[in-house]
C-alpha cells in the first residue's frame, strides 16, 4: 500500500513538473533594418545582437513560426520575402513577388503566409509548404498590419487609406466585413481569446479597441503619431509606440486608462511582448536601436544597437 501511495504521489509530481512553464526558454528578436537591408537577431536574455543577416532590399515586416523554425521578412523595395532558418539564422529561400510587401503574418496552423501588398491594394496568401501557391484578394488602398485568429479562419487587415479594418474569411479569401476605426490604421494586435482586436490609428493619435463579437469600438487617446501595438496577456495591458514624441504608451484594457508613458529611442515603430522574459521590445527607426522595457515595472531596462532604420513591423519574437 505504501508503494502504491508513493507511486501515485510520484506520478502527480511528475505531471505537475511536466505541465509547468519551462524556465529554460530562450527568446530571439528578428529586427528588420530597412536602411541597410539586414535583420538583426537579438538574444533577448543576453540583450545583444548575435547575428546580422543580409536580406532583400528595404526589409520592413517580420513574422516568425516556432513550429517551422522560420522567420519571414518582407522586403518592400526588393519585392520579395526572405525566409530565414531560425536554427542557423541564414536565408534559405527568397520568394519573388510582383508587388511591394509591407505587413506580413503567418497563420497559427503554419500553413499559409499572408502578405499585404502596399501599392497594389491586395493581400497575398502563400502556401508555406512550397512557397509557390499564391491566392490574392483586393482589400483597399495601402493595406498595412495583419492579424490572424488562433483557429486560422479569420484575417484582419488594417486598411490605412479607407480608415477601416477588413475582415477576411481565409477559406474563401474574401472580405466579409469592414470595421470603421480612426484615421489611417496601421498596426494591429489580437487577444489570445480572439475577442479583442486593437488598431493603432496614426493620424488621429488613437487606438481603437474592437469587440470582435459585437464589433463595438472604443477609442483611447495615445501619443503623437502612434504606429504599432503589443499586448501583454498576463495583465491585459497594451503598449503603443508613438513615433513623433519618442514614447511608448502603456494602457490598461479594462479601465482604458494610460498607466505610464515611457521615453524610448527616436521614432519608435515595431513593438512586441516577450512572455519568456516579461519584457517589451521596441525598434527605433530614428536611433538604430531596440529599447527593452521591463513589463513588471514599465521602466526602460536596456538599449541594444541594431542596424540602420530599424522597423520590425509585425510579430518579431520567436521563443525556443
Which role does the model predict for each range below?
Residues 1-8:
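Bacterial N-terminal signal peptides that target proteins for export
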Residues 8-16:
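Bacterial N-terminal signal peptides
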Residues 16-320:
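Predominantly soluble domains enriched in secretory-pathway, periplasmic, or organellar proteins
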Amino acid at each position: 500500500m505504501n508503494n502504491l501511495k508513493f507511486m501515485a504521489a510520484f506520478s502527480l509530481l511528475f505531471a505537475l513538473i511536466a505541465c509547468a512553464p519551462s524556465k529554460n526558454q530562450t527568446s530571439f528578436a528578428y529586427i528588420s533594418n530597412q536602411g541597410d537591408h539586414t535583420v538583426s537577431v537579438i538574444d533577448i536574455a543576453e540583450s545583444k545582437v548575435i547575428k546580422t543577416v543580409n536580406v532583400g532590399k528595404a526589409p520592413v515586416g517580420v513574422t516568425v513560426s516556432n513550429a517551422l523554425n522560420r522567420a519571414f521578412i518582407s522586403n518592400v523595395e526588393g519585392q520579395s520575402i526572405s525566409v530565414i532558418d531560425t536554427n542557423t539564422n541564414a536565408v534559405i529561400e527568397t520568394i519573388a513577388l510582383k508587388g511591394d510587401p509591407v505587413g506580413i503574418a503567418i497563420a497559427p496552423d503554419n500553413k499559409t503566409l499572408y502578405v499585404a501588398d502596399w501599392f497594389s491594394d491586395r493581400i497575398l496568401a502563400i502556401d508555406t509548404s512550397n512557397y509557390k501557391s499564391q491566392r490574392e484578394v483586393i482589400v483597399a488602398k495601402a493595406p498595412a498590419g495583419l492579424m490572424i485568429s488562433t483557429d486560422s479562419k479569420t484575417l484582419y487587415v488594417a486598411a490605412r487609406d479607407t480608415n477601416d479594418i477588413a475582415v477576411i474569411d481565409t477559406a474563401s479569401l474574401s472580405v466579409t466585413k469592414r470595421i470603421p476605426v480612426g484615421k489611417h490604421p496601421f498596426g494591429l494586435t489580437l487577444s489570445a481569446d480572439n475577442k479583442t482586436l486593437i488598431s493603432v490609428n496614426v493620424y488621429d493619435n488613437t487606438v481603437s479597441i474592437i469587440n470582435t463579437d459585437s464589433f463595438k469600438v472604443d477609442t483611447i487617446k495615445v501619443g503623437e503619431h502612434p504606429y504599432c501595438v503589443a499586448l501583454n496577456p498576463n495583465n491585459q495591458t497594451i503598449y503603443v509606440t508613438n513615433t513623433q514624441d519618442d514614447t511608448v504608451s502603456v494602457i490598461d484594457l479594462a479601465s482604458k486608462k494610460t498607466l505610464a508613458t515611457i521615453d524610448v529611442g527616436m521614432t519608435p515603430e515595431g513593438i512586441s511582448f516577450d512572455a519568456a522574459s516579461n519584457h517589451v521590445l521596441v525598434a527605433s527607426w530614428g536611433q538604430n536601436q531596440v529599447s527593452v522595457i521591463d513589463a513588471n515595472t514599465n521602466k526602460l531596462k536596456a538599449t541594444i544597437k541594431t542596424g540602420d532604420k530599424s522597423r520590425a513591423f509585425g510579430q518579431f519574437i520567436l521563443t525556443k
